[in-house]
Amino acid sequence: MLGIQYPVIQGGMAWVADASLAAAVSNAGGLGLISSINAGTEAVHNEIRKCRQLTDKPFGVNIMLQAPNAGEIAQMVFEEGVRILTTGAGSPAQYMAMWKEAGIKVIPVVASVALALKMQDAGADAVVAEGAESGGHVGELHTMPLVPQVVDALDIPVIAAGGICDGRGAATVQRDPFQLQQRFVGKQVHTDHTDHKQRDHRNGDRTQQLSGLCHFSLKPFARHCHLSFPF
């Protein structure tokens, strides 16, 4: 469905998942994703064009549907001919007909069986079942209990994410393909600050924290998972 050599998807991460990282992952045989989070529409457009200069392999764009310019980005990726989209923080239903007309593969990120079923009914081609071990805004279920329940409930492919950092993690949840995010933060190909890359590389198993509650339209409150910093 995705046209990739290896079952590895690089998740969309704000400030990290740029054209350079997406192209590097795609050139290596996985699926690279450009993040549109906290980015202007033209900036995302430029990253798409840059990625096409860096790779002739499949790549996609991640859209945060709660963003003020989500509608503009939804229209832009349609016009630009992006082939693969992942979505989060909202329902892509209002854009689905337009994207389907263009043959775009739409893969929402979900944190529950109920949301996964809604996305399937809306016409999603697959879903990313992302457990609470993931970074960023997370749900309540952890990856191990979440993924099997979503697999059993859906008729479309399910991609596992959350706490997976290598093939052993993917084998544990028995998912092919699987999505990685934080694993790519320390790589030199993207433009994130060097201090962040180095700190991520040094982190152990007790440096990730859950804090705060954020309001989303499809979920009243969502926790946020992040690295601990000395300030």
Question: How would you label these PLM feature ranges?
Answer:
Residues 145-155, 159, 165-231:
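Conserved active-site-proximal phosphate/metal-binding subdomains
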Residues 16, 164-165:
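Residue-level detector of alpha-helix initiation sites
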